[in-house]
Amino acid sequence: MSLTNEQIIEAIASKTVTEIVELIAAMEEKFGVSAAAAVAAAPAAGGAAAAEEKTEFDVVLKSAGANKVAVIKAVRGATGLGLKEAKDLVESAPANLKEGVSKEEAEALKKELEEAGAEVEVK
């Protein structure tokens, strides 16, 4: 008797995480492959899209640096967050401050935060 894809999916869905990890390890051993290799190869397929000009950028706070108070003030001004929310965001670095902004806005925000003492990355 051959199992359908639906039956296989249902069988896997009923397993615990530990059982699934053991299943993956057994499949890797039986077929001589690694799940990590398949995951690493996947981004290569999207390489053509990355060659296009990027129009939207994300501003990521990597660390607050030595002057955390100034960075919190800068984050509040840039995002419109309240004091507690801005403090929580700064303390949870690395964290996305803004997503999908123009290059000019991203660079301006990066400059403002770096002047306050933060380490910032534009992606």
From Swiss-Prot:
GO terms for molecular function: mRNA binding; structural constituent of ribosome. It holds the Pfam family Ribosomal_L12. Signal peptide: none annotated. It comes from the Bacteria. Homodimer. Part of the ribosomal stalk of the 50S ribosomal subunit. Forms a multimeric L10(L12)X complex, where L10 forms an elongated spine to which 2 to 4 L12 dimers bind in a sequential fashion. Binds GTP-bound translation factors. Belongs to the bacterial ribosomal protein bL12 family. Forms part of the ribosomal stalk which helps the ribosome interact with GTP-bound translation factors. Is thus essential for accurate translation. This is Large ribosomal subunit protein bL12. It comes from Haemophilus influenzae (strain ATCC 51907 / DSM 11121 / KW20 / Rd).
